[in-house]
């Protein structure tokens, strides 16, 4: 959900919200999942069918939605972890971790296989050699997330205006919805001194 393009130093991709159990979970139906929505990043320049998915948030309570790039090293999202929707930011870091090897034998694709596994699949297919070998780059991605607002009423939706350093926020107060246009708050990113305390909600 809520996919948007991001470009950090050393990594570009699509950032999105999902209720998948982790970044390494196998493909499957997440519609019936009971997991919380967290923020994930998938690389978009990798041409192989194995795209690296990195989990950028790990909420204990509530859900994370509406992720987008905040500045060159931070992303932002809305979370109701404390019971009220607040803006959170995450500091993103990526380091090269090396190459993964793909071995293709018939319809089988083996990722970083041991020699014993390759021999077993070769004998299953009645072959003496692999069909082809491929490689793709792998990174170790990490993020540190923290609240940057502590509102009394829930932040319903947000969008980022990219190069203009602006964000929009929609809040509900009583029967009315309010739209705010705000500048990116670099001071709060540096200080990280906002605490979104748990509420009764």
What do the predicted segments below correspond to?
Residues 152-165:
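Signature of short aromatic-glycine-proline-rich micro-motifs recurring in repeat-based ectodomains
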Residues 4-6, 68-69, 159-160:
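Conserved beta-strand position repeated across blades of beta-propeller domains
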Residues 68, 139-142, 146-149:
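Short linear interaction motifs
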Residues 52-57, 144-148:
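A short beta-strand motif characteristic of beta-propeller blades
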Residues 1-2, 7-47, 57-63, 77-128, ...:
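A flexible loop/linker signature enriched in serine peptidases of the S9 family
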Residues 10-12, 72-73, 163-165:
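Short coil/turn segments that connect the beta-strands within blades of beta-propeller domains
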Residues 47-51, 137-140:
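Flexible, solvent-exposed coil segments and beta strand-coil junctions
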Residues 127-129, 136-142:
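Surface-exposed intrinsically disordered loops and tails
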């Amino acid at each position: 959900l809520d996919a948007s393009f991001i470009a950090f130093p050393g990594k570009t991709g699509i950032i999105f919200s999902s209720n998948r159990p982790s970044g390494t979970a196998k493909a499957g139906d997440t519609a019936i999942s009971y997991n919380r929505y967290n923020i994930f990043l998938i690389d978009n320049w990798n041409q192989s069918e194995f795209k690296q998915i990195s989990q950028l948030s790990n909420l204990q309570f509530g859900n994370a939605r509406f992720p987008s790039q905040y500045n060159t090293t931070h992303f932002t999202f809305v979370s109701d972890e404390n019971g009220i929707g607040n803006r959170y930011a995450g500091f993103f870091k990526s380091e090269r971790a090396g190459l993964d090897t793909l071995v293709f034998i018939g319809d089988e694709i083996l990722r970083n296989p041991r020699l014993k596994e390759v021999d077993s699949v070769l004998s299953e297919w009645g072959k003496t050699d692999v069909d082809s070998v491929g490689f793709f780059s792998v990174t170790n991605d990490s993020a540190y997330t923290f609240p940057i607002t502590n509102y009394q009423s829930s932040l319903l939706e947000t969008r980022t205006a990219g190069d203009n350093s602006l964000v929009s926020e929609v809040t509900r107060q009583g029967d009315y919805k309010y739209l705010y246009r705000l500048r990116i708050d670099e001071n709060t990113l540096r200080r990280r001194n906002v605490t979104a305390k748990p509420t009764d909600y």
